[in-house]
């Protein structure tokens, strides 16, 4: 089993470049939100993570090892989670996203939830019932798929709950400009940019 980002990161972490323009996900996610979210928030987590590990033995550790082994280190947990979570978030969205999954992923969704629509309903519920800031996740766990949510910048890898293959950011900075307090409307719109091909690749890597 591997995760979407199993390659060990050393010599400091770098803010990943997006594979699409900031305005490419409009009208579902607006360009200003994307730019601030990537160039300020994600960049901040990256810089703060590097500062937290600078000059320590942690510089030789990969991001996933850091998140698990240094879970009690608040700076590493918060900023490492923010770095990893956003990297997954960007990579599972696309201007040509939306639609429905196919192949092995579609079969696994049916096996685990009964149908794609039921999975979406359960996922949206996890996103909506997460109090305050956090994330909702679709994970591989024990060969099947599960849904959960985590607070702040935590993720299921940190506690061994599963390998996330898809996640949605429900911090207010991810949606407030376009949707105000309408988290449900944001999550509904987000489905239109989910890159199911990328999610399927994550699934195959994780099983």
Where are these regions (language model features)?
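Feature for soluble, non-membrane regions of globular proteins
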Residues: 2-207
């Amino acid at each position: 089993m591997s995760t979407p980002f199993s390659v060990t990161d050393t010599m400091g972490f770098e803010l990943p470049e997006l594979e699409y323009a900031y305005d490419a996900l409009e009208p579902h996610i607006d360009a200003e939100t994307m730019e601030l979210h990537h160039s300020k928030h994600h960049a901040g987590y990256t810089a703060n993570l590097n500062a937290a590990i600078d000059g320590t033995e942690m510089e030789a550790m990969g991001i996933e090892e850091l998140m698990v082994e240094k879970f009690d280190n608040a700076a590493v947990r918060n900023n490492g989670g923010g770095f990893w979570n956003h990297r997954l978030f960007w990579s599972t969205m696309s201007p040509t996203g939306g639609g429905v999954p196919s192949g092995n992923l579609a079969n696994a969704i049916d096996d685990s939830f009964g149908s794609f629509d039921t999975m979406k309903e359960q996922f949206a519920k996890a996103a909506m019932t997460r109090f305050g800031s956090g994330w909702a996740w679709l994970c591989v766990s024990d060969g099947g798929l599960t849904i959960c949510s985590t607070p702040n910048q935590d993720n299921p890898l940190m506690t061994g709950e599963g390998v996330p293959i898809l996640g949605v950011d429900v911090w207010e900075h991810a949606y407030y400009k376009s949707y105000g307090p309408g988290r449900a409307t944001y999550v509904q719109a987000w489905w239109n940019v989910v890159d199911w091909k990328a999610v399927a690749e994550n699934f195959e890597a994780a099983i």
